[in-house]
Amino acid sequence: MLLLNDAPLLSMAGDIRFDVVVADALKRRVKPFRGWSRELSQGLGLRGPAHALLADAHGVWAWAPGDRYAAAKRHGGVREWMRAHAGTDVRLWVSAAFTQSIEDLASLPPRDDAGLRSHARQAFVDRHGDEAATWPLATWQNDVARGVVALAGIDLDALRRHGAQNGVRIRSVEPWWHHAFLEAKRCVPALAHAANAHVCVVEGRAAAWITLAGGVMSHVRRCVLEEASVSSLNETIERMRADRAGDDVPIVALGHGLGDGGDTTRLCAHVLGRLDGDQPPQWLRPSTQNEVH
């Protein structure tokens, strides 16, 4: 189960969410998805498919429900979007630029979730200063590893209050790199069977380097490219590969934001689609149909 600070997240196995659904719901025991979704719909009156937003350092990309082929529209920020879309529901994804993770997972002690979060928070404070004391945390675990992800740069409580003032309900908040990672696994079935592999999710200069062991996520590291270019990404991949992988370990790259990302023939990775463009490629568009889970 994933947990946010001291409250269990209402999410299915495999999700990584900084969830901000109604506070009293966070105290309930997790139920099977269909029953829980039905109860939520009846009790809270969900208002249909949610809008999807991706928040990055320059604003937000917004996808409206209904037209699956429409490109995302740019807005100055989440609050601006909320004021223009009163009375709606939204699922929010956040750029790797807004997430932090524990670099050395081996340093995490074998404690319970509360102890793990406490240890991780202190590690974030030691590295990033007192501001990290209030960052929302989400823990994840699977058969081979566990980890902690922090949300930095977005005040979720303030955002939720602003949404309430405009009748906007935030259904979920999660890292964009995790959404892209799941799409990479869907597109490259070999990732699920490789003993070791890597997925690099690119968002301009921000990138997430995800390590897999036995087909599941074992480590996440946030990277900052020297510049938003293929050559800079190649240097980062070579450095990460030298640190954590051999030449025979598969590497998959996907994303957007590289100025010359239309030509990736020089990249030492299997590239899904193109890596240029200001916004995520259409095939990576997040679903606006799924309910919070």
Where in the sequence are the language-model features?
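Hydrophobic/aromatic-enriched cytosolic interaction surfaces used to assemble or bind macromolecules
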Residues: 1-293
